[in-house]
Amino acid sequence: VVVRFKDNTILKGKTNNFFPNKTSFHLELVNGEQMEVHVEELKALFFVKSYEGDKQHQKSYGDKVPGGGRKIQVRFSDGETIVGYTTGYSPDRAGFYMVPADLKGNNERIFVVASATEAIEMA
């Protein structure tokens, strides 16, 4: 996973105890160090194909995601916008999963922390 904080800090590692209804989880960084992460401090949690990604990839957000649910556009407080699909968005929850509409991109799915967003639009 790639963990992006609201303060723009980025950490990479793995977790085996992240649950959307919990306020924190443990992250094992790529160097083996363990730490507790508080979800409210995050922008989003990115479940990625690789830690490096593809710097040459041009985001398209035009792909249809089979079984992905409703189309959603998320604008984060830092100005970044991601378009994808979700089956679990509710304005009453602290966050939700989405699958980006860019199947060739590095992100397989994203857990968006609602308090880090500026606008959320359903299509």
Model-identified regions with their sequence ranges:
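Conserved RNA-binding domains used in RNP assembly and mRNA/RNA metabolism
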Residues: 1-123
